Amino acid sequence: MSGVSVSPPGLISVVIPAYNAQQSLPATLDSLFSQTWPNIEIIVVDDGSTDNTAAVLASYGDRIRTVRQPNGGLPSARSTGVAAARGQLIALMDADDLCLPERLAVQARVLQQWTDVVLCCSDFNAFNEQGVVGLAYASHYYASIGRASKGVQSLLERVERMDLTGCLPASPVVAESDRQTTVYRGNAYRAIAHGNFVHPPTIMFRRELLDTVGTFDADAGSMCDWDWIARVAAVGQVAFVERPLLEYRLSATQMSSPRHRIKASTDTLRVAERICRRDEALYLAELPRFRADLGFFCADAADAEVDNDKWKAAQLLSRSVVRFGCVDALTLRVLLKILTPAWALAAKRHRRALHTA
């Protein structure tokens, strides 16, 4: 990344990939204009949008930097954005989420206060078209946190308290509980190798990190974030801010939604296998756990594929059982779907739709 001109310390570059985001972008950008951190560069990568995204971006003039490219998907758009960044700190964000006003200031303070931390993320609230879905939603969204006996504290061993003076928006009254936040930090590599719990739109890191781990790999597809985060966690500490710093939008268009499940589950399996190949020593040291991971990911991919291609689903399920020894309720459910005639499955789905209508 040494070929890019870098601004003096203090500038934070926020990188936002955007594809057909004309409806959500204005609120996303407005949330960044309201940040308590004063020195911000907003980079929006228009990833071949076919709606009015370009016109929306043009209306902001020089308040934002726009980079346009043919549609290349999330890995390409993220990589293009971080390559264009001039700030010493880089924050990731999606085109349909909202930053809380203190987000950038809080995360910058974490990276300034603990120099061994290479990546800072945070908890987040979730919302949809109907309103708030959940507060402090990370433990619900990420199984790694939800299953852990002490939540994030089970994954990151050090617990710190950090003062927020100067980070919060001006207010006549600030509750004592809001003056500080808990920050968990530590070596997250082993935990992340088994499944990501770092929410990509909440990430901030130092620009120099890109020289060590590179950018986002297109071969990882929709799971490029997990692949990249695992590489990051292998070289330094991860910090998790307990205070939610992002409002995360849940919608049918995002990659984590049911309509994209086939691609997401296939990409998850591919990245899990890649992580195992990349660190054979860790794979062998934790072989039973990795076998369970891969067996589940195969079965989950089979479940996603079964309505589309039963032969492919059968191959994935066979691999889950024969190669990884995974036999559980999911295995039996997928097997039943494979053996059930397509017309019977369609009739069952129709009855379910009528019942829920």
Where on the chain are the PLM-derived regions?
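Conserved nucleotide-sugar donor-binding catalytic segment
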Residues: 83, 122, 146-264
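Conserved donor NDP-sugar-binding/catalytic core segment of glycosyltransferases
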Residues: 102-166
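Catalytic core of nucleotide-sugar-dependent glycosyltransferases
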Residues: 141-151, 244-252, 257-284, 307-325
